[in-house]
Amino acid sequence: MAKQNLELKATSFTLSVLHINHNDLDIIAAELDNKLAQAPQFFLGAPLVLNLSAIQHTHIDFNALKQLLIDRNLIIVGITDASAEQIEQAKSMAIAVVKSGKQARKAELPERATKIVKQNVRSGQQIYAQNADLIIFGAVGNGAEVIADGSIHIYGALRGKAMAGAAGDNQSVIIANSLEAELVSIAGQYWLTEHLQQYDLSQRGCVRLEGASLTVESLPQ
């Protein structure tokens, strides 16, 4: 059989979602610069989906916003939760319109699977549980990344990065025997090390999303 020179296949990727809560580009630029300064390598060249739910009824200059992000080595690949006018603007600029996790969950979904890892996750390694929860019987070291579309349970120390609800599920949680993490994220909302330091990181804890903010709850050992 002759080899096909072009194939179209379905797959999925983990994308960061940037929630735009104001239409003033100067305010957006200042807040974005502050976030980028906290973790410049993590966001370098990152493809972003813009969530516009907070500004659906206001005008925003997409050309200027796109350039603002390009100037910071960020790339808009799509928008979500947008108004009809915003959708038309995005389409005219060849920006995709994607369904948010909330929209996607309107259809009945099968029961979520569980991916189990029975070893430590070391620096440079990445584990992704697609359409699944992730359970790790071991530690997640500095420089390692664990990602799940569902929740993440770590029976060991979390010292690297953990990203739960990667497909937009804001009910996902991160549980670990200790939370000395470089980064924790749920449904695109993230905290870096300095945000976590207000808690007792040596204790078993649970990171969850309450509204639009992360919170940490201590758990019994």
Swiss-Prot record:
Asked whether the keyword Signal is assigned, the reply is: no
SUPFAM superfamilies tied to this protein: Cell-division inhibitor MinC, C-terminal domain (SSF63848)
The molecule here is called Probable septum site-determining protein MinC
What is the scientific name of the source organism?
A: Shewanella frigidimarina (strain NCIMB 400)
Its assembly, as annotated, is: Interacts with MinD and FtsZ.
Q: Which GO terms describe its biological process?
A: cell morphogenesis; division septum assembly; regulation of cell division; regulation of cell septum assembly
Question: Entry's NCBIfam families?
Answer: minC
Reading the lineage from the top rank, the first entry is Bacteria
